[in-house]
Amino acid sequence: MCLLKSTGLSLILSALLVIADSYPNSDKTNMGCEECTLKPNTIFPNIMQCTGCCFSRAYPTPLRSKQTMLVPKNITSEATCCVAKEGERVTTKDGFPVTNHTECHCSTCYYHKS
């Protein structure tokens, strides 16, 4: 009887290890958001723009930092945005001046949605 229990337990543990090992190791935080790259603009043909995701995270503000804030906040966030590293000013057929991005990278976010 004891041998049957240990064999059954071994089979269950082996099955759990196989399931855990087959689980994908990919990072789930960026699912649905592509890497920061150049893509064609949907409105202006032949104009490239930087789109995609970079790094962002939020965490509870440490007490020491919170005590030095003028307006204490419970959550602190860090982020980098997909921005143009280089670009050139061009004019569209309709006379609109736009920036055609030539290279992208992740850098400090200057504009945040409120």
UniProtKB/Swiss-Prot annotation:
Signal peptide: 1-22
Record localization: Secreted
UniProt keyword terms in alphabetical order: Disulfide bond, Glycoprotein, Hormone, Secreted, Signal
Keyword Glycoprotein among UniProt keywords: yes
GO MF, one example: follicle-stimulating hormone activity
Glycosylation sites: 74, 100
Pfam families according to UniProt: Hormone_6
Disulfide bonds: 33-53, 36-82, 50-104, 54-106, 81-109
GO annotations of cellular component type: extracellular space; follicle-stimulating hormone complex
UniProt keyword Glycoprotein, yes or no: yes
BP GO annotations: positive regulation of steroid biosynthetic process; thyroid hormone generation
Chief location of this protein within or outside the cell: secreted
SMART domains: GHA
Subunit description: Heterodimer of an alpha and a beta chain.
The protein's role, per its UniProt record: Involved in gametogenesis and steroidogenesis.
Family under the similarity heading: Belongs to the glycoprotein hormones subunit alpha family.
Official protein name in the record: Glycoprotein hormones alpha chain 2
Organism expressing this protein natively: Oncorhynchus tshawytscha
Classification of source organism: Eukaryota, Metazoa, Chordata, Craniata, Vertebrata
